Amino acid sequence: MKVTTEQLPKRIVALEIEPDAATIEKELNKAAQRIASKVAIPGFRKGKAPRFIVENYYGKAAILEEATDEIINVAFRAALEQENIKPVAQASLEKLEPEPFRFRILVPVEPEVILPDYKAITVDLTEEPVTDATLEVALDQAREKHVVLSAPEGEPEAAEGDQLTATVQTLVDGVPLHKLDEEDDDDDDDDDDDDDDDDDDDDDDDDDDDDDDDDDDDDDDDDDDDDDDDDDEGEPTTLIMEERRIVPELYAGLKGIKAGETREISAHLPADHPDARVADKDVVFKVTVSEIQNRQLPAWEELPGLEEFEGDLDAYKADLMERLVKNSGDHHRRNVLNQYLEEVVAATSFDVPDALIAERAHELLHEQVESLARYGINMEQYLQIVGKTHDEAVQELLPRGEESLKSSLVVRKIVEAEGLSVDESEINAEIERILNDFPDAQRGPARRRLEKELRPQVAGSLLDKKLQDRLVELATGNAAA
């Protein structure tokens, strides 16, 4: 067998393979036997006609066609072994010549990843401090979970602490925000249409008389539509009558409002408002209240019990502060890891087969759909919702797939470069630590699972922890030389 190799970009190895005569003859004989077993040839039982008889009936070309796939498979496997090539994705046949029998096949191989001097890369992120103000916010949030709503008697007026259900329309210079969006879209469309106006003018002249009659009929309908748009105040929303929760002018303007009442309240929104359409602008809020409810918050002393905490309020506050500090530290650690990996990936040299990127994008799509399974959404339904075919959905995820793959490759390279590993004693110790959290009656079955089918996951978790610890050391410049 003759094999020549050629290294192509994106880690593709092209193999030119010419199988030896013995391989071809062997597969031709098998192909003739398969054909003979499928058809009736006079004078022979099925599968018993010799090859030359089958050739006489069906021709050499039919036998070669039947044998081609197996010749390629056998020769390809032999060539991979001979050249010590390990595919990482499906190979593709590029060219096939029957006389003499030879073919060219493209094989994706292991990506090439050249790390930068990753030990010289550091990130400088300041951890947000957990203050008494942070604790106060968390306490308020915990207390809010247990608020009790009640309908007041009579015709109540909105007062401090009440909860309002209302529709709110925001107007800028008398124009609702949704109208501003439509005008922006229309401006864009007008720009696109300008180039076509000259071409359409002649046709429009011919149609003007007919259109005038139609337009007259539609005028009344259009007026009705405009009125509906102006009255469209959006979906009901919840407003809490506390000055720190809503715009001060809105808070003041809603005092004393009753259910069923509509008020227009002027306000000036700050320059740092998250919605650029209203930032540093005078606006009018058109508010229609549909319901007013009293809010009864639990007494502070009741909060520990409501949160199923064993201890008094001071102990609960101390525990909450401890959790806030831990969460803040974990969040900071994740940010450090993410930024460090982003910078290392950006400085790394990659040569990656497209097939691996597509494979990762395919995995991301299926992970995305699996996360929706609890809502009863399967792949077919998901694709209908997004209006895409499976291939289109994968194509859309290629950039994320490439980013995810490169990050994984960098992590794997760093694990190798740092010599990170876990031994059996570490795995056993981790299993014992996990078992301590189980009741005595459940430890036996849990141990069997952990020591057998879950052992690889325990090892992977330990290695991941070591890796994260090392990456944080590297990222913060605290790694030992």
Swiss-Prot record:
It comes from the Bacteria. Its main location: cytoplasm. GO terms for cellular component: cytoplasm. The keyword Protein transport does not apply. GO terms for biological process: 'de novo' cotranslational protein folding; cell division; chaperone-mediated protein folding; protein transport; protein unfolding. Residues 182-235 have a biased composition (Acidic residues). It catalyses: [protein]-peptidylproline (omega=180) = [protein]-peptidylproline (omega=0). InterPro entries: PPIase_dom_sf (IPR046357), Trig_fac (IPR005215), Trigger_fac_C (IPR008880), Trigger_fac_C_sf (IPR037041), Trigger_fac_ribosome-bd_bac (IPR008881), Trigger_fac_ribosome-bd_sf (IPR036611), Trigger_fact/SurA_dom_sf (IPR027304). It is an enzyme of class 5 (isomerase). Its EC number is 5.2.1.8. Residues 173-245 are annotated as: Disordered. PANTHER family: TRIGGER FACTOR CHAPERONE AND PEPTIDYL-PROLYL CIS/TRANS ISOMERASE, TRIGGER FACTOR-LIKE PROTEIN TIG, CHLOROPLASTIC. Involved in protein export. Acts as a chaperone by maintaining the newly synthesized protein in an open conformation. Functions as a peptidyl-prolyl cis-trans isomerase. This is Trigger factor. It comes from Herpetosiphon aurantiacus (strain ATCC 23779 / DSM 785 / 114-95). The lineage of its organism: Bacteria, Bacillati, Chloroflexota, Chloroflexia, Herpetosiphonales.
